[in-house]
């Protein structure tokens, strides 16, 4: 069994360099919620050095709230803003001898695109316009995955090690209790259940079906690196290969 392990990078956390030794894919902030041209270059350089797949992590234009504010943008605006961000990272990767492999939206752009078909379409269209060979990463079973498939893109369905799930397979909003799993044992058990058995127990006790093709590790948690190491070790014990 094989699984991709991804992390959001270039967001100002000191753990980036070490996380790049543990993950197989990096989602690099493109300036709209965090990061800038210099951090994008640095992250790309480190990803290439570690053999990690390079991806863009576009966001709503919301540096004040780290891309976590809901926005209602016209589809053409969402298309242009997404294309602008991923095009910049693609150029930076190419200039350093690398290749951008995937795109994963950030924060509320990701969450809204999981449910809003028009926004999902705008993002998928931007990814296709940039490079039809790119992989589009989205929440398992979401509108974004459906939109990507409609454009003929390769999609990758994502699950979260440290996020609570609702009965419909969506994430518990960060503003609600149960959104974040802080117990390491619970996060490990949830991840293995999703990867090995394709299901997750919701905060209300029901099982939801999920397709786990990539697991997100958050680099901003207090014990992010320790958990990443433990998850890698657990995957190795279970014969699960980590690869992009």
Curated annotation (Swiss-Prot):
One GO term of the biological process aspect: carbohydrate metabolic process
EC number: 3.5.2.9
Stored CDD domains: LamB_YcsF_YbgL_like
GO molecular function: 5-oxoprolinase (ATP-hydrolyzing) activity; ATP binding
Signal sequence annotation: none
Membrane recorded as keyword: no
Entry keyword annotation includes DNA repair: no
Root EC class: hydrolase
Catalytic activity: 5-oxo-L-proline + ATP + 2 H2O = L-glutamate + ADP + phosphate + H(+)
This protein's UniProt keywords: ATP-binding, Hydrolase, Nucleotide-binding
SUPFAM superfamilies attached to this UniProt entry: Glycoside hydrolase/deacetylase (SSF88713)
Subunit organization: Forms a complex composed of PxpA, PxpB and PxpC.
HAMAP family: PxpA
UniProt record similarity statement: Belongs to the LamB/PxpA family.
PANTHER family per UniProt: 5-OXOPROLINASE SUBUNIT A, UNCHARACTERIZED PROTEIN YBGL-RELATED
Job description of the protein: Catalyzes the cleavage of 5-oxoproline to form L-glutamate coupled to the hydrolysis of ATP to ADP and inorganic phosphate.
NCBIfam families (UniProt xref): PRK05406.1-1, PRK05406.1-3, PRK05406.1-4, PRK05406.1-5
Protein name: 5-oxoprolinase subunit A
């Amino acid at each position: 069994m094989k699984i991709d392990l991804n992390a959001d990078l270039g967001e100002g956390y000191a753990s980036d360099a070490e996380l790049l030794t543990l993950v197989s894919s990096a989602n690099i902030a493109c300036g709209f919620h965090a990061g800038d041209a210099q951090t994008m270059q640095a992250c790309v350089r480190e990803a290439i050095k570690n053999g990690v797949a390079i991806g863009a992590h576009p966001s709503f234009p919301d540096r004040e709230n780290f891309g976590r504010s809901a926005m209602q943008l016209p589809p053409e605006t969402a298309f242009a803003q997404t294309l602008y961000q991923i095009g910049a990272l693609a150029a930076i990767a190419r200039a350093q001898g690398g290749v951008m492999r995937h795109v994963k939206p950030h924060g509320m752009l990701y969450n809204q695109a999981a449910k809003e078909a028009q926004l999902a379409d705008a993002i998928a269209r931007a990814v296709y316009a940039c490079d039809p060979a790119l992989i589009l990463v989205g929440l398992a079973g979401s509108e974004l995955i459906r939109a990507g498939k409609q454009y003929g893109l390769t999609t990758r369905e994502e699950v979260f090690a440290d996020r609570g799930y609702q009965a419909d397979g969506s994430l518990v909003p960060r503003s609600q209790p149960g959104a974040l799993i802080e117990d390491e044992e619970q996060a490990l058990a949830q991840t293995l259940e999703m990867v090995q058995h394709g299901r997750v127990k919701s905060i209300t006790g029901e099982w939801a079906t999920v397709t786990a093709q990539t697991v997100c590790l958050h680099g901003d948690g207090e014990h992010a690196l320790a958990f990443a190491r433990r998850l890698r070790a657990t995957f190795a014990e279970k014969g699960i290969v980590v690869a992009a």
